[in-house]
């Protein structure tokens, strides 16, 4: 039996064996990553549940206070600074201005006006028809 395996392995070049092994390893890695991706939602839910279960009443009260929020943005992305949000007292910017707004824009008043029925005569094959 060993002689047959040696003879069979001598027929297949080493390069092909290496390529097959690499392809199998890549396929295993892809399968592993697919499995990880498919279970990410469940893992997130578990972590959230664990966070709610381990939270004590004092930490839940503290989590509602705005001073507890920590800014980790400079650690995650270096040289990142958070831009301040506008205050609620300022009005939002207008979507249109004088240059983009047409004075002859359609309005509901123009739509409510009933136009008289279009009555005119047309010529079809030399005979008059009334529409």
Swiss-Prot record:
What are the entry keywords?
A: Cytoplasm, Nucleus, Phosphoprotein
* Stretches with biased composition (Basic and acidic residues): 107-122
Instruction: Tell where it localizes.
Output: Cytoplasm; Nucleus
Compositional bias of type Low complexity: which residue ranges?
16-30
For this entry, list what GO says about its biological process. Answer: protein localization
| Nucleus as UniProt keyword | yes
List, alphabetically, the InterPro entries matched: RNR_inhibitor
Task: Name the source's superkingdom.
Answer: Eukaryota
Q: Which portions of the sequence form the region Disordered?
A: 1-37, 107-131
Provide the record's note on post-translational modification.
Phosphorylated by DUN1 in response to DNA damage which leads to its degradation.
* Keyword Protease recorded: no
Q: What is the recorded function of this protein according to its Swiss-Prot or TrEMBL entry?
A: Mediates the nuclear localization of RNR2 and RNR4, 2 subunits of the ribonucleotide reductase.
Q: What is this protein called?
A: Damage-regulated import facilitator 1
Query: Which taxonomic lineage does the organism of this UniProt entry have?
Result: Eukaryota, Fungi, Dikarya, Ascomycota, Saccharomycotina
């Amino acid at each position: 039996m060993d002689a047959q395996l040696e003879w069979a392995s001598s027929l297949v070049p080493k390069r092909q064996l290496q390529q097959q092994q690499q392809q199998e390893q890549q396929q295993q890695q892809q399968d592993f990553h697919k499995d990880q991706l498919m279970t990410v939602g469940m893992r997130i839910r578990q972590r959230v549940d664990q966070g709610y279960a381990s939270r004590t009443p004092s930490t839940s009260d503290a989590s509602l206070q705005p001073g507890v929020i920590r800014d980790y943005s400079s650690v995650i992305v270096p040289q990142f600074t958070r831009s301040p949000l506008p205050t609620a007292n300022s009005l939002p910017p207008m979507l249109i201005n004088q240059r983009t707004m047409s004075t002859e824009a359609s309005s509901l008043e123009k739509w409510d006006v009933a136009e008289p029925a279009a009555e005119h005569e047309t010529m079809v094959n030399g005979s008059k028809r009334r529409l």
